[in-house]
Structures are given as C-alpha cells and as structure tokens.
Amino acid sequence: MPRRRVVGQRKILPDPKFHNELLAKFINILMVDGKKSTAEKIVYGALDILAQKSEKDQLELFEEALDNIRPSVEVKSRRVGGSTYQVPVEVRPVRRNALAMRWLVEAARKRGEKSMAQRLANEMLDASDSKGSAVKKREDVHRMADANKAFAHYRW
C-alpha cells in the first residue's frame, strides 16, 4: 500500500472520429510500438467493414461485442498453508473492459484473414453473435471460476 496518496486514474481523451472514450481505449490497446495512426486506421477500417456487413450501427455492434466478452468473475492464485488455490473473485468494471478489449485484439490477431481490419471486423461480428474465440476465452474463465467455487471463502 502506498504511504502517501493514491494516484487517480488518468482521464482518456475520446477518439477523434466517433468521440467515444471506450473506442479510444481500444485503439490504445491495439496500438503496437506507439503507432497510433496505424491503430486508428485499423479500427476505423474494421468499423467501416462492420457498417457494410450489418444493418446495425457500427458503434452499437462494437459495444455489443464487448458486452459478450466482458468477464464477471475470474480466478486469482492464493497461497494457503503450502498449497496454491485458484480463488474466484469478481472483476472490477475497469478491468472488465480492459480484459474484454485485450481478448478481442488477441483473438483478432490469431485469425486467418488477410488484413487486420478484416480480422477485427469478423471477430467483432462473431462476438456480437456470442461466438468466436474471444467469447470462448470468457467462457473458459467463467468455467474455471465455477469449478473453483469451493475456494471462494479464501477471498481477500
């Protein structure tokens, strides 16, 4: 624990095109080696593909995809008396968003399509339909937490 003061979370500026803070955070998570304009091109390209493929609003689809990926519980390792238990704990809202975005980017990177924008768009479409590897990752995390429900009393 810090002895002085706890530093507050930095306010993130909304993205230039849609003026959405969540999308700006997503662009930052996708960014590699500080190349923000490249990350923006990829995300906006993916959203344009989403707009063409679906009659729904592209931002709405993005939000829906994230909703289907967000985990509500996860497991954390806790050492008790020489043995390590996987203790299920609830995920804080900020971490929920961060994990969902990270899993979406990882799943998109593993896909086989040619461009990253195409991969991201298809993964978002899959996630909004509750399928795809990002949603599978969430299911796995939830299953792991459910399997270790017996150790929930070790929560701290």
Curated annotation (Swiss-Prot):
It comes from the Bacteria. This is Small ribosomal subunit protein uS7. One of the primary rRNA binding proteins, it binds directly to 16S rRNA where it nucleates assembly of the head domain of the 30S subunit. Is located at the subunit interface close to the decoding center, probably blocks exit of the E-site tRNA. SUPFAM superfamilies: Ribosomal protein S7. PROSITE patterns: RIBOSOMAL_S7. Keywords: Ribonucleoprotein, Ribosomal protein, RNA-binding, rRNA-binding, tRNA-binding. PANTHER family: RIBOSOMAL PROTEIN S7 (PTHR11205). InterPro entries: Ribosomal_uS7 (IPR000235), Ribosomal_uS7_bac/org-type (IPR005717), Ribosomal_uS7_CS (IPR020606), Ribosomal_uS7_dom (IPR023798), Ribosomal_uS7_dom_sf (IPR036823). Pfam families: Ribosomal_S7. Belongs to the universal ribosomal protein uS7 family. The keyword Transmembrane helix does not apply. One of its GO terms (cellular component) is small ribosomal subunit. GO terms for molecular function: rRNA binding; structural constituent of ribosome; tRNA binding. The gene is rpsG. GO terms for biological process: translation. The lineage of its organism: Bacteria, Pseudomonadati, Pseudomonadota, Gammaproteobacteria, Alteromonadales. It comes from Colwellia psychrerythraea (strain 34H / ATCC BAA-681) (Vibrio psychroerythus). Part of the 30S ribosomal subunit. Contacts proteins S9 and S11. The keyword Protein biosynthesis does not apply.
